[in-house]
Design a protein with these regions (language model features):
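PLP-dependent class I/II
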Residues: 1-181
Length: 181
C-alpha cells in the first residue's frame, strides 16, 4: 500500500481512536517502492500492533516463527494469552530466526530479486496470452482475470489440473473475487 493511502487511513484511525493490527509478513518482498509500516506514521506507533515473521522474508515457511511489535501494555496482554494457549517455537527455530536477522539481508535481497523476475515473467506471459492481470507490487502471487472463461476460480483451477497438469490455488482462497469468475 502506498504511503499516501496509509496516511489517509491513519487520519481516520486517529480521529476515531482505533487500534490497528498490521500484518506485514510480506514487508520485505515489495518490488516498486520500499515498504512503509503504518506504525511509522505520526501518532500511529502507540495505536499499532505489527505482526511479522520469517516465513516469507527468509523462506522459513513451516518454522512457525513470528513476532509482534507494539505498545508495551498491549504486547504484555498478548503474551499472557500466548504463554498459556500456544506452545512456543522450538529453540532451533528461534536461533535460526536470530541468525536470519543478523546475517540474512543479502539472502532476502536475492530472493526479492528472483521473485520479482518471476513476477515480471508471469505478467509478460499473461499479456501475451491476452489475459489481463492485476500487477502485484509485493509477495509472489498473481491473479489473472479468468472471467472470459465463464468458470469460478475453483472450476478453473480444477480444469487446469486435469487438462494441463498445472496446480494453482483458486483466487477465492485469497478473498479475490474480481478475478475469479
Amino acid at each position: 500500500m502506498e504511503k499516501s493511502d496509509l496516511e489517509k487511513i491513519a487520519e481516520v484511525i486517529k480521529k476515531h481512536d482505533i487500534f490497528v493490527l498490521s500484518d506485514e509478513i510480506y514487508s520485505e518482498l515489495t518490488y516498486l517502492e520500499k515498504h512503509v509500516t503504518i506504525a511509522s506514521l505520526p501518532g500511529m506507533w502507540e495505536r499499532t500492533i505489527v505482526i511479522n515473521g520469517f516465513s516469507k522474508s527468509h523462506a522459513m515457511t513451516g518454522w512457525r516463527l513470528g513476532y509482534a511489535c507494539g505498545p508495551r501494555v498491549i504486547i504484555e496482554q498478548m503474551l499472557k494469552i500466548h504463554q498459556f494457549a500456544i506452545m512456543c517455537a522450538p529453540s532451533t527455530s528461534q536461533y535460526a530466526g536470530v541468525e536470519a536477522l543478523k546475517n540474512g539481508d543479502e539472502d532476502v535481497a536475492q530472493m526479492r530479486e528472483e521473485y520479482n523476475g518471476r513476477r515480471r515473467y508471469l505478467l509478460h506471459r499473461f499479456k501475451e496470452m491476452g489475459l489481463s492481470c492485476f500487477e502485484p507490487f509485493g509477495a509472489f502471487y498473481v491473479f489473472p482475470c479468468i472471467s472470459e472463461f465463464g468458470m469460478t476460480s475453483e472450476q478453473f483451477a480444477t480444469e487446469l489440473l486435469n487438462t494441463e497438469k498445472l496446480a494453482v490455488v483458486p483466487g477465492t482462497a485469497f478473498g479475490c473475487l474480481l478475478y475469479t469468475s
